[in-house]
Every structure is written in C-alpha cells, then in structure tokens.
C-alpha cells in the first residue's frame, strides 16, 4: 500500500501556482497533531499562503537500550495521523487522517515545506540516549529517510529536544491523567545533538534538517554549539554545519511557576528588580536571547529564526498594589492530591484537577469558541470590549518590554498575551537584526470566525513592510536572456558574510530593509551553473533591475554508425531530456555529432532509420558532465506489416479511437480519423495484442492477438452500445456533426448547508457526448439551468438555450444540444413536426414514454418504433430526422406497459399522415380534462411577518383558469385560520386585508385562498406564516417554553434514580425572570443554565404517572404554562426484543453512500437480517464523552425540516417485525475517551437518553482508532481490581456495566472490535494491541455477543503459532474465531483472556469486496469456515485445526458490514445474507419439511424426489417459478415455468448425490413456499 501511495502522489501532484509570502523571510508555523479534537482546527484550515514552512508536531521515538538498532519514529496518535476522515476524506484514500490533509495542503501550496517535528515537551525524553548512541542515531535517521520515501510530500525533520543538559520535564507534571517522565540528560548532550543532526544530514542529504532551540538565556550557550563556542567542547562541527535553519523559543520566559506576575515573551528586559525575569547583568528577554545565539554561540543570522507566540499566561490571586498588577505576588492554587501547585484554568484545560496550564490563547481572548472562555478583547481592534471593561478589565502596554497585558483589580487576575501591536514590533526586531524569519507556536491558537488569522496576517504584513531609513536590492538571475528558475540568491556584507538568502522559484529576487550606506555583494547558487557575483558600493538608494549572470556548460555526444565495417549514412541520432530534443544525422562516413547538451541534465540517446534497428537501443547519460563517444551498429533490415481497419458505431464511423498494439516492452498506437479508419505499421515476427479504446466506450472485439506477425492484417472494430446510467447526459452537434470539446454547464441551487449553489462543467468527447456523474446531483432536487454558454464555446450559440428550473430527473435522461435552432432535447421544440405534452389533468408527467411507430416504406425506410421521454414539464418531441422519408404514421401513443400500466388519452391516434408543419399532440391520463381555476398567492411571501398592533396585512392572490373557454371564475374566498375575510377583485387580482388583535401575535397562522369555477371545479392554495409584534403599541409577548428532556417521557427504571428535567424558556421582548416546576405535590425553582435552559433533577418514589406543570414568568409578570406527564415504569422483560437462536446481524448506515445506498428500516422488514445495528452514535465535536446520534436528516423530513418522529417510526417498523435494533457507538469517526468519572456519567446518561427516545434494544461497542487507546499498556492484572488503576479502561467497563444493570438482563450488549485490539494481544500487549481484552474479560457476564471484525486491520497469529492474514481466507476465520472461544495468554504479561462461550460469538465479515479494504470472503468460503467451527466438517484447503474443545455447535452466527452493502450491486442483491440464511435453514435435515408458510394459499404445494428428479406439484394454482439452493446458499436451478401447469419435474446433476436442498416455489398468484428436501437416493 505504501509503495502504491507514493506512486499515486508522484503522479498526481499538480504543479500549481498558488499564493505564497511575497517577502524574503521564512515563516515557520507549528501545527499540533491534537488540534483536530477540541480545537476543531484541521489541516485544511491552515493558510499556507502566509507560511514558508509547516512543522507537524509531534512524533515520538521508540528506543530500547538493549537494541539501539531498532530505534524508530513513533506515531503518537494513529487516529489523528492516518485514520480520521473529517472534511470529506475519501473512504478509499490510500492514506487518511492528517497526512491526507497534509498531502492536499502541499498540492494547494507547492511552495510550502512540510517537516515532521520530533520530540516536544512530553515526548523527547529519549533523544538524549538516542543521540549518545551511534547505532541509535543512525537507525533513527534511516527511519526518517524511509518515512520520506513513503510520504514524499514531507520535506524534512525538525528536532524539538526540550532540553539538552538541563531543563525540561521533572516527572511531577500530569498530562491526560498520567505523569510525564522526567527528561534524561548526558554531559555530552550538546555534542551528541550535533552528531544526531549529522546522521540525519547523511541519511537525507537533500531534505531539510532543523532544530527548535531553547529559551534559557543563561544556559543556551552551554546547551547548543555554534561556530563561536564549539571549540571549547572539542568540536570542529556544530549545529549550523548540518541544519538548514535553527528556530528558537521566543516564549515561556515568564509564567505561573514564579508565583508572581510577569511576561510570557518580553521583547526587551524590563529593568525592574521586582520582575522575576530580571538579572543585574543578564535578564530573560528575546533581545538578550537573540544576542546569545548571534554573538556568544555564533549562529549565522541568515539561519536563525525567532519564535513568536500566539498565546500568553494567566495569573490569579494577584496582590493589590500601585503597579497595575505588574511584578507582584500571584500564588498558584494548592489542590489536594496534586504534587505541584496548580495554575489558573487555561483556554483548553480539561477537568483534570492537576492538569491546569494557565495558557491563554488569542482565539480565546477575542471570543472564539473554546473550552474555557476569557473573551475580553474586540477581534477588530484588539481593545477591551465594553462588557469586559465594565467587569473591570483594563489593557496596558509596556513600552519598555514592548508587550501588552490585561489586569482586573476586582478579580485579581493578570493576563500576559500577544496582539497585533506586539507582533508587529517583534517582526520589526527580526528584520532589524537580519534574522532569517519568525517561527510561530502554534497556528490553531490564532483568531478564527469572521476575522481569522489576525496574528498570522500581521506577521505577513509586518515582514512585507519597509523599515524607514533602509534600502532594498531587487533584480533577477539570468542565463543569457532567460531567467534561471529554482535558484538560491545570497546577499553578503562587506565582510563577505551571508546576511540574507532567498530561494527564487522564478529567478526574481528582492532583499528589503538593508542598512543604507553599506557595501553589498550578490551571487547565485545552482548546480552545474557558474555565476558572476555583483558588487554594489555605498548603497544609499534602492537598487532595482540588478542582474546576476550565469552560464551553464554544454557537452557533445558523437560517434559512428556502422553496418559491420561499412559506414551508414542518413541515420538520425536523437538526444532527449524532458522537453529538450537534439538531433544529428550520420554522414557518408557514418559519423554524427550532437552538440549543446546542457550540463547536469539527464539525456537518453537513440539511433533510428526506417526499416532498421540499432544497438545499443538506447543509452542514458545521467547529469551529463563531459563529452561522450557513442557508436551504433546497424542490425538486419526490419520488415513491417500493417494492421488496419475501421471503427464503426453501427454504420457511423467513429473518430478519435486509439487503437493500440501492445507487445512485451512497449506498444504502437494509431488514432482513427473522421472516416473511422486507422493503420498500424508493426515490425514482423512480433507478438501483438490489439485493442481499441475511447473514454466511456467499449468495442468488439475486446482484443485480438497476432503471434509472429508475418502478413498485413485487417481488423475492424464495432463500438458497443453503452447505455448511460447518468441522470443527465446527451450529445452536442453542429447540424449532424458531433462537436468535441464543447463545454456544457449544469447549475444547481442552494439546497441545504451541505448542498450549496454550484456550477459544474462537462466537456464533450470525440463523439460529442457529455454526461454528469450522478454524484454531481446527489442531494439536489432542482436544476437551475443546463446550457452551453457561448463565451465558453467560441461565441457559438447552442440550442435549446432555455433549459431552466426543472427537477433533477429520477431516471437517466438525454438532453441534446445543436447549433441549429431546431435542435431537439428532452424539451419540446416548436420546430419539430411532432411534439406535445403529457399531463395528469393539469399536472405535467415527467418520464412518460411516447411511442411513434412508422411503417415499411422502402428499402431504406423500414418499419421502426421510436420512443420519446417527457421532461420535467411533461414536454416531448421527435426530431424531424425520425420521420424523414416517411409519409404515414402507424400509431402515436403511450403504451400502458411502458408507463406503469397507466392509460393515457387519446389512445387512438393511428394511421395518419406525417404532418408537414409542426403539430402538437397532447396526451392526458384523463379522457376529458375540465378547465380548472389556478390560484397563486403573490403577497406576502415571508414565513415571518412583524407589524405593530393596529396595523393591517394585505393578502394578494392571482386567480386565473387552466384553459381559455367559456368557463369563468364564480367565487374566490380568503379565509384565515378558518375565518373568512372580505375580498376585493381587480382584473383577476384578489385582495383581502386583516388587522390582527393583540392575542393573535406570537402565533402561527394559515391563509387559504379557494377559487371556484363556473363548471364547479376548484383550486386552493395555502400560505402559512408566524406573526410577531414590532412597534410601540405591541402587547407584552409571553415567554415561550420548549420541553427538552427527557425526550421520551416514559422513563424505564429498575430502581428509582434521578430524572433530569430540562426546558428552554425565552422571552422575545424582554427577559425571563424565573421558571418553576410543580411535580409530585411540590413547586420548585428550576436552575438557570446557559442558552436559556432551566433544569430540575427529579427523583421519583413510585412507578406511576407524574403530572408536570412548568411556569415561566417574564420581566413584565407575564406567565406561560407548559403541561406534561412523566411516566416512571419498570424495565419489563418484554421491553427488549430477545436475540434469535441463530443470528445474521448487519449494520445499517445513517448516511448516504452511492456505492451502498441508504435503506429505511422498513425496507429491512422481511430481509434475512434478524438483528440490525444502527450506525452510529458519535460524540459531540469529538469530545469523547457526549453521545449524539448521527441521523440522515434529509430522509426524514416534514415540510423540509428533519422530523425525528419519522425516524422513530421507521425504527419501530423493523422492531415490530420482531427484529431487535441495537445502536452502535463509535465507528470510524466515533471518538470515545472517558478520562474521568464525570465524563463517564455524561456518557452513560447520554446513551440512556438516546436508547429511551428511539427505543433501541441495546448498545454495540464499536470503538476504533484512538478510542481503543486506554493508556493501559502497563496493565498486568486483568481483573476488575487490576484495571482500577487505569481510568480510561475502568470508566468504559463501568459505563456498560451501569447500562446493563440499569436496563436489566433483557438489554442487549454487543461489541465489534477489530483484530488488532483482541487477537493482537496474543503476541503483543500495548496501549492499543490487545487493548480491548480487559473490556471483554470484565464484561463477559454482561456481553451478549462479540463479533471481532475479521477485515481491514489484517491478520494475527493463531493458537498454533501460524500467522493468519486475509490471504488465508477461511483458515483466518477458523483460526481467529477459535481464539476468542478458547482463550489465550496475553503476550508475556502473565495475564490470560479466558475466552467466551461460542453462543456469544459471531464471525464478522464484509458483505462484499467494496465494503472493506480487505478481508472479503465469498459466502461459500465463509460458510465453509463456519461449518467447520460448528460441526468439525473439513473443507478444501483447510490448514488450521481447531484446538481441543471444538467444534462449537452453538457458534451464534454472522455479523456483516453492512445491510446496505449486502443490498447493493456490489453485494449481488443480498447474496451474503441469503446464503447464510439458507445455511442455517439447512441444519435440521428432513425429507420434506415446510420452513416458512409464506402464504396460506400455497398449502397445497408438495416437493419431493423421485428417481433423482425433483417433483413439484400444486393442486390449486399453476406453478410460475421454482428455485433450488444447496446448503451453502448457491443457486442450482432457477426454473421459470412457461407451460402454465401445476406440476414441474426438474433434473440437475447435483440431484444425484445425497444432500439437502432448499426449494422455493412461486405460484402464478405470487404466493411462495419454501421446503427442505433431501434426496435419499432410494
């Protein structure tokens, strides 16, 4: 897969010209892997136009001191990196997750360099021992190089070692509930870091190598070696020797650890002795840190990049004094159970008591959605908002340190942060010091929403600004007059030190903000080029149009061409490099010479002359660097033969078809011309396979093989008839000639938030054909327009040009276009001799089929039948070419059998002359169509109307008639909510006025306009709207109460527990002053929460109905009452549908999928699935603990709005048929992590609400990816007591134990983990491998079913020690299923998984090949494995033998992904479920056994064997169909009885063996009956 992926990337990577920074500085942005979770900041949201480099952070390392050679990179979150599919990542993408998004980001911004950052604060502890070991650092560097081969869009690696020698973690910090290991040190860390970088450079000579250096002003000269300090440590090389650039932390100078307010990132020292960062000789600041790196360590300025923070620090408990909160005591919190004092709560801090960061990000300060809000700044001005100011917040700017801060003396809080002002000053500082650029930590911290990327935009703007008093130098690099692309330009000072570097993609360069009055020199660097430096003296004004000239040497390839010893003239020798081709022709002496081969390029040299071959066939010179001599020898004359012919579509020539003759090592090709002819000249004696190809077409013959070609051949092809499955397709012609390359535009309207307005272009092929894939119109119901725009088609007009506002066709429909105005499409065209409309009364009928039948007229005009299909407006037409040459029409009609058995009138249009002028022939379902009124309500049209009390609303309707005859309008009645209104008429425009009373506001109203015609026909239209009051006279609007929870007011409880009651109360013209609840004899105040919610926790005391009265009072004493009833009921044994004895379980999709179409649960009634899992419950914003049911909203609409009751009814329809419906939590996108008891309780209560509301029969645990990491790799006691030390593990177990206990034993609990997390534990136990085994072990009594997914994640070792992967098919199923029943020791942990009873185990397989990435078995292969496991009966190819204890006759059945895939075309119309159903049905053999009395009318049917023939008789009805299956579900006989008799005798070779058959008999009345029949051969 990885090799395929790399090839795919290299082939598809587009050469795009996209936006990139215009300045010459580097802008390095760190992106945190975890940003996809709470932050919801996925990679596609990164603005690559403002960055030059992106550091993806972080990767860790695996290091074993005993085996340093195994040191490798370590992915820290496989779900984030490679598994998630957020943002529409294709399910079949070769890599998913952030790495897919990084690839797409690179495609969007080709200039952007993407690096993997290794280490970080919590995952760099092993960098010290790795760097100290020559073997380990070489192994790590080699793994990095391999990583880039696999993912070629990665440009290098960044080492974030925090920190060499000193600093970093101390082992007391807690992250995600676990202590972070302490940083490891070696006295030689500083030297070993250089050696690690050297190993990386050697392994990746052409890739980027960088580091992130620390911020400790007093220590960095010891921690990092550069040109100025390396000698004192005995080094002749340093970090800058091997790094492309060096970033350094420009933040975390000050923080809460000082228990005193200070700055996170001061640009300059404060000079204040009270500042914790102050030092008499050396303070902590960016300026002093930069001086250390430049002057003490000696890093070149053009390699040094300064860090820029997008975050700051918060301090609480700030002591009051006169410094506005600055440099005063701010002690942290002392929290029981925490080793360290705790910081204030930061932007994204979770509920962990000992995990507070105090970190405040700019996105938080400007009010963007975060976990813990500190919204004090206006996002436009970045000044304090009025509400924050009124709460006591004040912004200060320290002009000494050049940073802002916020202080609230009332709350005693202080926040150090960065804004646009401080960011600009930091960037100006970078420019003034001639540093290489700025580094950002971290991109997801920037502002979002309506004003995104404020700080990143400021960085870009500031780098592009000109510093007053400076000069710039700009120009280009050229070779002659041509620009030299992809060239490096260096700017040096008078001391010849490089001060700035630019890599120019197009050859142009610019250096800005240079000190005036200095001497500068410029030169360029590029392999194989020689450049002349340019020197500029005393530069006091801007220098433009500076040209650096370069030259590139050229070389010659020469030699002779001989036939034996005889010179050969006239031979063309060609040297090719990319698009460059150089040639020479040999002279009479056989000599040739090709000059001008550019140095450094790769050239392929060949010789050619018609009828001859030459040796060598080709010679490649890679990176040519000298003159070359190459001689050729001419071979024997080559005789060529032709393969030629024509390609026709019926009798029409087909142009543009590529005919290819393939042979070992290559191919020859020709393209058919306008006459459809082609000709291939092929060397004799070869073996060729000849095929024809044209996009979207197939041809007969598919291929023809010529072996040892020794004569000319004629080979004609016929284009096959291809029936388009596209709903919208057609042809574009100029008269009768197809138009290739025409652009057809389809415009679709905004439909919902996921189906926006869009325009899609289809381009015609060589045959003038176009089509739109059905995915283009999926989710849309209407087409705004379908046309060819003249401005896109050479100013040529195509007709029709009025295809607009029609419904998306349900079936494939052809829309043709032509340059002639008489061109015909699915719309009627008046110029056609025969056209018309088809209607049902006055309603157009789309998709109706109109047949014209023409008689035999002469030898060129035979009898023919042609169909026209109506468009969305019911229009049809026949092109005049259809009737050309005919004088008579046999019939024109709509056949009932082609139109759903509907009769259309007239039905007697027959034997009439072909009209000579365009004539309309209309059809209707009604024999006589009465003229009817037509009502249109024209005003108002808004769904909400706001007026003042005393104002009137004027209703307006237009009333006409459907046809012009003697019929008139006799009356028009306006009624509002059933009450008539006075009406006025003016020329068919009717009006009525209504002045609402005070009590009619804040309500919904419906206007009905009914018109009656003189013939008694009527038409009515309605208009619904809500009325609100707006103005001085408005009465008080009462509060509105909405019931939230419990959503299902029947609450099932085994014991009395709290029932949370929640409502929403809002007041449109004021505020809600209070909400009360009266229940169980008492009245209580409800607790106000966010978003106008009010809650009350009610604990029942009896199983009964509890009336509930909720009253909301507004600020004007207006009261609204809401009544409801909560029923507390026991969990009865019949609340949940029990599992069947033999199970076929399928997952049902809650989304659309073109390959596996959506199915309603009602459609599953009667299918072979007897248990169905609803997919899926996920968690809100992937928080890991707040369940939310995914729903296919567009499938359950009422008046265009999702109606959950329709979904409930749909689920109920399947449950009513006796099939349990279980809801599955997780899936590929369902992220579940329960870090603490609070999250566990939210999770359990959320699942209860979903289960109760939708009446699910149980819950299925389908955790995948990151949800399977329980941080329990160190577990060594699998018991319940043992898992208690691992919160994630214990909380999951407790959650499902609580659900089972709450609902009782009838509640179904199932699980469907992947093999990695179950059988993977046999050989390896880590945080993920085998991670689900403790869950199964501790839920073994609660679990009803376990179905380990034997697909996608690959195979594992079986109990016999052999590896069983998907290639071993049936043997993999038997081996891995045997494991979960038998049990096994868990790796080398000393723990044991005890296995589950076979009655709780399902085998789990994909329904068809497309349903999973791997693991598909045919029904026969799967049933072979199941039959062996259940009975011990062997199968062909079996290599695995069950362990003692098998077989397992109680093995419960099959789970499959999914019901939808099984029902799809991929699933061959439910082949899998039918086969397993037949297998289970076959397990109780009987000579003749009725399985299923499908219809009472078929009780006279008998099936039995006589003389090895199957006899089927029915005394009452003729037999229509007999189908016979074997026990594997394979169809042996499908006999359609055309004799209309009551007895059928069938013969089949399979009947001659003693076995059991399933016979399904269908009679003429459609009744079915199925039998098990055994041929006992007697």
From Swiss-Prot:
Record localization: Secreted
SMART domains, alphabetized: Glyco_18
EC number per UniProt: 3.2.1.14
Region called GH18N, residue ranges: 26-446
GO biological process terms held by the UniProt record: chitin catabolic process; polysaccharide catabolic process
Region described as GH18C: 1142-1462
Main location, first listed in the record: secreted
Signal is among the record's keywords: yes
GO molecular function annotation: carbohydrate binding; chitin binding; chitinase activity; endochitinase activity
Sequence positions that bind chitin: 92-93, 119-122, 163, 249-252, 441
Enzyme class: hydrolase
Top-rank lineage group of the source organism: Bacteria
Free-text note regarding domains: The C-terminal region (CTD) is necessary and sufficient for secretion by the T9SS. The CTD may be cleaved during secretion.
Stated family: Belongs to the glycosyl hydrolase 18 family. Chitinase class II subfamily.
Name by which UniProt lists this protein: Chitinase ChiA
Organism taxonomic ancestry: Bacteria, Pseudomonadati, Bacteroidota, Flavobacteriia, Flavobacteriales
């Amino acid at each position: 897969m990885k090799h395929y992926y790399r090839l795919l990337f290299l082939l598809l990577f587009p050469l795009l010209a996209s936006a990139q920074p215009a300045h010459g500085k580097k802008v390095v942005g760190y992106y945190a892997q975890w940003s996809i979770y709470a932050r919801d900041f996925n990679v596609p949201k990164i603005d690559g136009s403002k960055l030059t480099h992106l550091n993806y952070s972080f990767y860790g390392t695996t290091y074993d001191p005993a085996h340093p050679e195994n040191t490798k990179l370590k992915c820290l979150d496989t779900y984030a990196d490679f598994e998630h599919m957020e943002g529409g990542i294709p399910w079949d993408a070769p890599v998913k997750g952030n790495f897919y998004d990084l690839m797409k980001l690179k495609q969007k911004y080709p200039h952007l360099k993407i690096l993997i950052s290794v280490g970080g604060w919590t995952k760099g502890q092993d960098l010290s021992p790795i760097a100290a070991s020559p073997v380990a650092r070489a192994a790590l560097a080699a793994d990095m190089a391999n990583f880039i081969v696999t993912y070629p869009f990665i440009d290098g690696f960044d080492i974030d070692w925090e920190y060499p020698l000193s600093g970093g973690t101390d082992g007391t910090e807690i992250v995600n509930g676990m202590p972070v290991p302490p940083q490891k040190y070696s006295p030689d860390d500083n030297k070993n870091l250089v050696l690690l970088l050297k190993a990386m450079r050697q392994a990746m000579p052409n890739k980027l190598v960088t580091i992130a250096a620390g911020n400790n002003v007093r220590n960095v000269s010891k921690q990092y070696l550069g040109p100025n300090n390396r000698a004192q440590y005995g080094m002749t090389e340093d970090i800058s020797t091997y790094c492309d650039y060096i970033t350094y932390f420009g933040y975390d100078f000050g923080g809460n650890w000082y228990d005193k307010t200070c700055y996170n990132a001061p640009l300059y020292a404060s000079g204040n002795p009270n500042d914790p960062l102050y030092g008499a000789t050396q303070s902590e600041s960016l300026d002093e840190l930069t001086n250390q790196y430049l002057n003490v360590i000696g890093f070149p300025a053009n390699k040094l990049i300064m860090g820029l923070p997008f975050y700051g620090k918060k301090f609480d408990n700030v002591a009051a004094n006169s410094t506005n909160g600055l440099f005063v005591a701010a002690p942290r919190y002392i929290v029981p159970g925490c080793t360290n004092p705790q910081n204030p709560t930061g932007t994204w801090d979770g509920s962990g008591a000992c995990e507070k960061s105090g970190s405040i990000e700019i996105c938080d300060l400007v009010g963007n959605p975060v976990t813990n809000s500190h919204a004090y700044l206006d996002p436009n001005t970045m000044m304090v908002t009025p509400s924050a100011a009124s709460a006591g917040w004040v912004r200060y700017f320290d002009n000494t340190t050049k940073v802002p801060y916020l202080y609230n003396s009332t709350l005693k809080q202080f926040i150090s942060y960065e804004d646009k002002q401080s960011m600009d000053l930091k960037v100006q500082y970078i420019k003034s010091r001639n540093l290489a650029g700025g580094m950002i930590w971290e991109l997801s911290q920037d502002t979002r929403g309506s004003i995104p990327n404020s700080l990143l935009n400021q960085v870009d703007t500031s780098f592009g600004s000109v510093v007053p008093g400076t000069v710039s130098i700009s120009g280009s690099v050229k070779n002659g007059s041509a620009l030299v692309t992809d060239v490096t330009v260096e700017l040096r000072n008078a001391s010849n030190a490089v001060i700035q570097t630019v890599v120019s993609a197009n050859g142009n360069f610019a250096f800005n903000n240079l000190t005036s009055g200095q001497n500068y020199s410029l030169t360029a660097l590029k392999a194989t080029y020689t450049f002349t430096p340019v020197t500029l003296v005393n530069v006091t004004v801007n220098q433009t149009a500076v040209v650096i000239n370069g030259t590139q040497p050229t070389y010659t390839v020469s030699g002779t061409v001989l036939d034996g010893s005889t010179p050969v003239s006239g031979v063309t020798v060609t040297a090719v490099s990319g698009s460059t081709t150089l040639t020479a022709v040999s002279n009479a002496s056989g000599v040739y010479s090709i000059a001008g081969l550019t140095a450094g390029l790769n050239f392929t040299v060949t010789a050619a002359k018609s009828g001859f071959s030459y040796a060598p066939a080709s010679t490649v010179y890679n990176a040519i660097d000298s003159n070359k001599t190459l001689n050729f020898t001419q071979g024997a004359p080559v005789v060529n033969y032709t393969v030629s012919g024509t390609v026709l579509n019926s009798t029409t020539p087909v142009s543009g078809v590529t005919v290819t003759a393939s042979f070992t090592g290559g191919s020859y090709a020709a393209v058919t011309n306008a006459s459809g002819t082609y000709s291939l000249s092929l060397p004799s004696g070869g073996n060729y396979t000849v095929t024809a190809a044209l996009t979207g077409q197939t041809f007969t013959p598919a291929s023809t093989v010529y072996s040892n070609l020794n004569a000319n051949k004629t080979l004609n092809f016929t284009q096959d008839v291809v029936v388009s499955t596209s709903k919208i397709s057609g042809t574009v012609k100029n008269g009768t000639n197809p138009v290739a390359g025409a652009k057809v535009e389809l415009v679709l309207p905004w439909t919902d938030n996921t189906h926006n307005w869009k325009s899609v272009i289809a381009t015609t092929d060589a045959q003038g054909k176009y089509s739109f894939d059905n995915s283009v119109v999926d989710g849309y119901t209407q087409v705004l327009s379908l046309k060819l725009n003249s401005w896109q088609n050479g100013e040529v007009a195509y007709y029709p040009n009025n295809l607009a506002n029609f419904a998306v066709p349900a079936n494939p429909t052809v829309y043709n276009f032509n340059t002639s105005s008489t061109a015909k499409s699915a719309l009627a065209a008046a110029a056609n001799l025969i056209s018309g409309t088809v209607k049902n009364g006055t309603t157009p009928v789309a998709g109706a089929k109109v047949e014209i039948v023409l008689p035999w007229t002469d030898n060129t005009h035979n009898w023919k039948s042609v169909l026209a299909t109506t468009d969305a407006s019911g229009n049809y037409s026949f092109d005049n070419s259809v009737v050309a040459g005919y004088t008579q029409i046999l019939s024109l009609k709509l056949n009932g059998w082609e139109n759903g058995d509907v009769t259309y009138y007239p039905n007697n249009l027959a034997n009439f002359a072909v009209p000579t002028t365009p004539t309309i022939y209309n059809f209707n379902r009604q024999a006589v169509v009465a003229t009817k009124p037509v009502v249109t309500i024209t005003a108002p049209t808004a769904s909400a109307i706001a007026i003042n009390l005393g104002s009137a609303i004027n209703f307006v309707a237009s009333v006409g008639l459907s046809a012009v005859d003697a019929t008139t309008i006799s009356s028009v009645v306006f009624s509002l909510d059933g009450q008539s209104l006075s009406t006025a008429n003016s020329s068919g425009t009717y009006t009525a006025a209504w002045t609402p009373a005070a009590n009619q506001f804040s309500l919904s109203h419906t206007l009905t306009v009914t018109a009656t015609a003189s013939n008694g026909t009527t038409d009515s239209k309605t208009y619904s709207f809500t009325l609100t009051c707006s103005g001085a006279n408005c009465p008080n609007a009462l509060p509105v109460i909405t019931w939230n929870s419990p959503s299902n007011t029947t609450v099932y409880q085994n014991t009395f527990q709290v029932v949370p009651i929640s409502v929403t109360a809002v007041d449109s013209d004021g505020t809600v002053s209070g909400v009360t609840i009266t229940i169980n004899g008492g009245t209580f105040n409800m607790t106000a929460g966010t978003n106008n919610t009010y809650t009350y926790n009610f604990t029942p005391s009896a199983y009964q109905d509890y009336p509930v009265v909720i009253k909301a009072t507004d600020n004007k004493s207006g009261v609204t009452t809401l009544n409801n009833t909560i029923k507390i009921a026991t969990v009865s044994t019949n609340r949940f549908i029990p599992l069947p004895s033999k199970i076929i379980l399928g997952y049902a999709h809650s989304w659309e999928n073109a390959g596996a179409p959506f199915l309603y649960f009602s459609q599953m009634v009667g299918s072979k699935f007897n248990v169905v899992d609803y997919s899926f419950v996920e968690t809100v914003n992937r928080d890991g603990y707040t369940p939310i049911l995914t729903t296919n909203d567009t499938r359950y609409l009422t008046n265009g709005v999702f109606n959950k009751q329709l979904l409930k009814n749909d689920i109920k329809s399947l449950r009513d048929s006796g099939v349990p419906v279980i809801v599955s939590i997780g899936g590929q996108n369902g992220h579940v992590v329960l870090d603490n008891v609070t999250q566990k309780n939210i999770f359990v209560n959320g699942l209860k609400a979903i289960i109760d509301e939708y009446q699910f029969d149980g819950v299925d645990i389908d955790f995948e990816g990151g949800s399977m990491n329980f941080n329990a790799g160190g577990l060594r006691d699998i018991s319940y007591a043992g898992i208690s030390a691992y919160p994630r593990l214990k909380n999951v177990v407790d959650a499902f134990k609580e659900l089972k206990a709450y609902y009782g034993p009838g509640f179904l609990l199932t699980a469907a983990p992947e093999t990695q997390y179950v059988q993977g534990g046999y050989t390896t136990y880590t945080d993920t491998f085998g991670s689900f085994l403790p869950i199964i072990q501790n839920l073994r009594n609660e679990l009803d079913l376990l179905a380990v997914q034997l697909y996608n994640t690959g195979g594992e070792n079986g109990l016999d020690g052999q590896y069983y992967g998907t290639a071993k098919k049936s043997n993999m199923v038997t081996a891995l299923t045997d494991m979960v029943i038998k049990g096994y020791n868990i790796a080398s942990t000393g723990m044991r998984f005890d296995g589950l009873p076979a009655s709780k185990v399902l085998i789990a397989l994909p329904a068809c090949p497309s349903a999973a990435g791997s693991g598909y078995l045919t029904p026969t292969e799967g049933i072979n494995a199941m039959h062996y496991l259940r009975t011990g009966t062997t199968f062909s190819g079996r290599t695995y033998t069950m362990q003692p204890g098998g077989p397992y006759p109680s093995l419960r059945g099959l789970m499959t992904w999914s019901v939808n895939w099984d029902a799809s075309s991929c699933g061959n119309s439910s082949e899998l479920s039918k086969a397993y159903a037949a297998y289970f049905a076959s397990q109780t053999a009987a000579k003749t056994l009725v399985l299923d009395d499908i219809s009472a009318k078929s009780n006279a049917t008998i099936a039995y064997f006589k003389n090895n023939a199957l006899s089927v008789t029915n005394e009452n009805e003729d037999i229509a169909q007999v189908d016979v299956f074997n026990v594997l579900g394979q169809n042996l006989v499908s006999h359609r009885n055309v004799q209309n008799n009551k007895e059928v005798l069938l013969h089949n070779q399979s009947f001659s063996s003693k076995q059991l058959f399933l016979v399904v008999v269908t009679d003429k009345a459609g009744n079915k009956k199925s039998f098990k029949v055994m041929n006992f051969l007697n």
